[in-house]
Amino acid sequence: MNKVRYLITLVFFLIIIPFYSSESQEHNNSSAIVDSQDFKDYWYDGKAEITSYKLEQARYGELHEGYVVLVFVTEDFSKSKQVKLDHPQNAKGDDVKVLKLNRIKKFDTGIYRYSMMDSVFTPVYMDEYPNTLKVTSSSQEWCGNTFTQLNLDSNGYEVRSFSYFESEGDRTFSLQKEVLEDELWTRIRLEPESLPVGRIKIIPAAMASRLTHKELEVEIAEASLGQNPDDSNLMNYKLVYDDSGRTMKITFSKTFPYEIISWEETYLSGFGANAKTLTTKATRNKVLISDYWNQNKPLDRVLREKLGLNR
């Protein structure tokens, strides 16, 4: 009997020890990039990475020219209030380092302009904080304003949505905790290997939800990550949504700092007989590393020219 117990115990440890070892190794690997000196030199230098992109935006069944600016910067963030800390030295354990993405999109549809912006707050140490803490998204055009905010809580994401459309109205609801399409961009910059692949549950991008007038909900998509067929130095990450057929493909550099080169988004644009499947495209234009919050004098407008933002 003792011999049998010994064998059972031995088999148990032979199985469980490699499991914990692989878990520990995975944890260490997930922190290797963000703990590297290259990461610290690039993201903790007191400046932001600002990249402009040339845009072809699908809207109303047509393609419209515009531009996008992606602003990536690290910040100290409050876990409880989910806002940027004014005095992180006094946070007493409430602080978490995040990589913030501000995505600004502007394009004209005939006489009037769309001005859209997202903010995404993703913890740098995703092994400790695996979910993005907060997303905000706003849209302004001549018809009116809309605003959506997602906050992570213990049950998932609390969503608050405000719109001038009667059918969309002002709403508060909850979504289960799943990966956000909006956080794919920050995951790429932090650690591309953290990108989910295969059949996944995902919450679509807030900006895409606004443009398609589709309420945010957890959806099923097929996600893939692979080498760009035209350039071995680049990677492609692609999403294909089951229900809508909408696709999103992000192309980024294979090596640190994993710069986002371009993206494409294909979906049904327009209403009624004018609806057609079109592809929004954004291609990288200029890059600037700057403490832009200090560059606010009239003479600093030259920096907009360096980014190719003359409009």
Predicted regions and their residues:
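Bacterial N-terminal signal peptides that target proteins for export
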Residues: M1-I8
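Surface-exposed beta-loop interaction hotspot
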Residues: N151-I200
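Bacterial N-terminal signal peptides
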Residues: T9-P18
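N-terminal Sec signal peptide cleavage junction
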Residues: Y20-E23
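Generic secretory/membrane-interface signal
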Residues: L14, Q176, D230-S232
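Acidic, serine/threonine-rich low-complexity disordered tracts
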Residues: E26-S154, E193-R311
